[in-house]
Each structure stands twice: as C-alpha cells, then as structure tokens.
Amino acid sequence: MFRTVKQRLAVGATAAVLAATAGSFTASAADAAGTDLTYGSNILLQNQYGGNGGYLDTNGVSSQAGATYNVNTNQTPNSRGPATSVWKVVSATGKAAGTHVTSGDVIYLVNQYGSGTYLDTNGVSTKSGAKYMVSATSTKDRGPGTGKWHIFGKTSSPTDGRIRTDDIVHLLNDYGSANGGFLDTNGGANQSGAKYDVVTSHYTDRGAGTGSWKVLPSN
C-alpha cells in the first residue's frame, strides 16, 4: 500500500518524536545514577536521621585510650576545621586504588584532617541503645577489626552491587568477627560545633535513619 506525501510526513514526525523521547529518557536515567565509588576516593557521609543528621566529622582531641580525635556529626561539612568531614575510602582487603567499591566490601575510612586518622570503635558505650563508642585513631588496626568496616548498600541504580554517590549505606564494624555494630547517631553531642554523637548499634537503623548514611562527593 502506497502512502501519500502527507502520510509519509506524519510517520516521519512520529518517529522523530519517539526518538527524542527515548533519548530524553535515556539521558534522564543516566543523570539519575550516581558516580561509581572507587578506592582512593574522598567522600562525605551524611547521616539520614530526620533527613539530615549531619556529616560524619572529627572534633577535638579524644580522651579515650588509643584514640586521637572525637567523632560526631556536624551540621555543615568542614565548617569546624579543614577536611574534618572528608573521609578517604581505602580497601582493607588489598584492592587497588581506582577499583570499584562493592556492597559487602571491607574498608577503612581515613579522615583527611591533619595527617589522617582511621574511623575506629573504642570501648563500650553507656548511651541507651548503643554498643561501642566511636573515635578516630592514627593506627588503622588499633584492635582486631576495630578500624575495619563492612559497607552495605541499601540499593543502587543499576543494581549491579556497586556503591555510588547518593547511595544510602550501612557500615558494620568488624570488631569481634563483624560484631562491632552499625555506625549510628545517638543523642546530642557534647563537643563544640557538633550535632549528634556517633556510636555503634546492634541494629542497621536503631532509630529512623540513625544508621543510614548517604555517600556524597567531597567537592
């Protein structure tokens, strides 16, 4: 069956609209996905309690044995000091810098303030619902597994196991054969300029979003 010129023009216009729509959908899907997180990257970790539980941050010299700095959250990243809210992701199993970080990996989180300190569990916490206190130390393995964290993504896009910026993650401490508890905010912090205290908890989310952390680029 032969089409008239008018029909051929209509078909061509429809095809163009469909192509443009498909292109727009593809671009939108790509834009929605975060950037793949790789080892050696510097990130911010935003707690999700109340939608914004503050950014994981070092704040002042710690009085805990073996610790260097206190750890809590801060309302505005790096507002208290240079790079106090910036954390470098380092493999605890020997994966090379530039390798993709995958859900279930074991990592070190190295704070970039000063000469760099490792996120660490240190001593039993007395706070209600908490397991261990959290601080930063100059030694990456102060105790067996105290400085290692299992990173678990809640989900991602695409669902290929990789961790990306804007993903929500849970961080399980490796102390006691991965029994050190999940990184958690718990009550107001005592340090000047801080928002919430940071401890570990038995639960992924002890409260609404207290154990959930959004991965964000540091710049």
Task: List each language-model region with its residue ranges.
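Secretory targeting and sorting signals
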Residues: 1-32
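Lectin-like carbohydrate-binding module/patch detector with strong preference for beta-trefoil
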Residues: 30-219
